[in-house]
Every structure is written in C-alpha cells, then in structure tokens.
Amino acid sequence: ASRELWVTFGVKFLGVMAYKVTVLTLALWLMVDFGYGDAGAGNLVAAWSVSMTVVTLLVGSLTDAIGLRRTFFLGVWICVGARAVMAFTTIKWLALAAGLFPLAVGEALGTPVLVAAVRKYSTTQQRSISYSLFYTIMNLGFLVAAFLFDYLRQSLGERGQLTLPLVNCQLSTYRTLFFAAMVIEIAILPIVYFIRRGVEVTDDGIHVTPEAPRQAGDNLWSAFWRTVGEGAKGTLKLFRGLVQQAGFYRLLAFLMLIAFLKLIFMQM
C-alpha cells in the first residue's frame, strides 16, 4: 500500500476522535457555559449540522480545483482555529460566529475528502479491504473519543475547571474537552505533511505528477492569492455544471436526510 493510504488512515482516526469529542460536548457546552435551554441548544446544533451538510456539497468542486493535499490542510487549519476559539473564549457571539460555524466548514472539508483519498491512493485490488479498514478505524476513533469524553467529564465534574500551566488560563469542563479536540486536530498537521504532491495510485503503480512551477517574480503571498483566486474560479465553474445535473438534487435530498438522522443520533 502507498504511504498516502496509511496517512489517510491516520488522519481519519484522529479526525473522527476530534469530531466525536466535539459532537458529544456541543449541546452541554451551550447549556452549561452559555445558559441556553435544551431547545435553544438543540436548534443551534441542528443549524450547525445542516450547515456542515450544505458545505459538503461544495467540497468536491473545491478539491478538484486545488487538490486533495491542499484541501486537507485547509480543513485542518480551519478546525484548529475554530476549536481554539471555542476552547478559550467566553463571549457567546464570538464562540458561535468564529468557532461553532467555521468548525462546520472545516469538518465538511475533511470527511468526504478522506473517502476520495482512499480511492485515489489504493489500487483496484486494495480498494475493498482499504474501505473496510477505513470504516473500522472510524469506529475505533469513535470508541476512543467516547472514553476520552467520559474520562475528562468525570474527572473535572459537570462544572469543574482546568488551569492550564504556564499561561494560567482556566477552562471549564466543556471548554477543556474542546481544548482536547484541538490538540488532537493539531496532531493531524504533521501527518498530512507526508502526503506527496501530485501522487496518484493506479493498477500500474504510483505516479507522481509534478506541480506547475511558480511564475517568475512571484513571492509567497502573491502565489498564495493567485492559487486562492484560481481555486475559487475553478470551484464556481465546476459547481455551476453540477447544479445543472438532475442527480444533484437527489443527492441534496439524500444529504439532508442524513443530516436529520445525525441530529437524531446526537440527541440520543
């Protein structure tokens, strides 16, 4: 198996751990730290889940435009930043606007891309066992996350506090759980670095397509903004073609159904 396939498995394990800890914490954090009622917290979690589903529709076009590796990095950095806001801020509007809903974007950038990565980085013979391992690792990550959630919550108590050394910052029980999820998310970054640029696995072997060289005279920032612009244009072009397909609306209906099923499981 290619190195990139093992990297994908590692990213999946850590990613679902961070995601599951977050999902288990969300409603309790909203109620205990910000005083929301059960219905209000449920409505916000519902909006978060639906927004994640909506962003998922755009991810395929974005990935085609900027590539798997860049999409991985973009999603992880957004998740790290959003979880940092949720862990350290006590300002309600900031936690929601710069934490909760950006996190939906970051999570949406990761999940479908990982599924595509398994296909891209495995041969035809490896694909069946690769997807079996992928979903086994996902369930293992959920299991470990549940134990981590229970351990931290029981250790600190419902309204406990954790004082971080060096910075002398106090975190509530549920912000501590977001902090733990952020640390797990940060651990993904060095793993993603091992994905080689332009790699694709076929039945004939591993092929590496060199990236186009940067234009002469470009500095880092100008190259970055040009990549952003080209990625945005490519994403919009691909998405316009997508919405003209009849199957797109069937997919949309299916994803909305999945979103509401997720809400049911999150409230159980």
Regions found by a protein language model. Name each.
Residues 55-68, 153-154:
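Helix-to-loop junctions at the C-terminal end of transmembrane segments
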Residues 13, 82, 94-110:
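Hydrophobic core of transmembrane alpha-helices in multi-pass small-molecule transporters
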Residues 77-92:
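C-terminal ends and interior cores of transmembrane alpha-helices
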Residues 1-3, 126-128, 150-266:
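Intracellular loop-helix junctions on the cytosolic face of multi-pass helical membrane proteins
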